Amino acid sequence: MKLTNYVQEVSLADFGKPFHHKAYWNKRLKTTGGRFFPKDGHLDFNPRMLEENGELIFRKIVRHELCHYHLYFEGRGYHHKDRDFKDLLAQVNGLRYVPTSSKSKTNHHYSCQTCGQVYQRKRRINLSKYVCGNCHGKLIEKNQS
């Protein structure tokens, strides 16, 4: 998919306005669907949003970034907090927030021997140092299956 051409098509179809700058894929984006750069007008998009969520959701992400783009160049409020932005986003049916990834990001699972409270962590914890926050019972690491 030629990203800049796709963004130009979405801009004309959904906004009735041309997109005059470039759009790029940015693999370094982790928690966001895209970014608008007011300094030079280009847009960055997260390729995983297209892979994980499909073209329908990705089109809504493109609309979101184009709201920033068009409002900025019209001299209107282009930030998330601005009424102009919220109104235009609702008008074109863009996404306000990016859908969360279905992939689990927790690597370590612990449970309390006494009360059964479950803890999920990205980083390993020292079981001789930490105890359950509920009952101060001993924690054990659960096996991943």
From Swiss-Prot:
Required cofactor(s): Zn(2+)
Superkingdom classification of source: Bacteria
Residues bound to Zn(2+): 64, 68
Keyword annotations: Cytoplasm, Metal-binding, Zinc
InterPro entries recorded: SprT-like_domain, Uncharacterised_SprT-like
Residue intervals of the SprT-like domain: 4-140
Active site: 65
GO BP: response to stress
GO cellular component, one term: cytoplasm
Cofactor mode of binding and number, as noted: Binds 1 zinc ion.
Subcellular localization: Cytoplasm
GO molecular function: zinc ion binding
Pfam family, one: SprT-like
Main subcellular localisation: cytoplasm
Keyword Cytoplasm: yes
Family: Belongs to the SprT family.
HAMAP family per record: SprT_like
Name listed for the protein in its UniProt record: Protein SprT-like
Gene source species: Streptococcus pyogenes serotype M18 (strain MGAS8232)
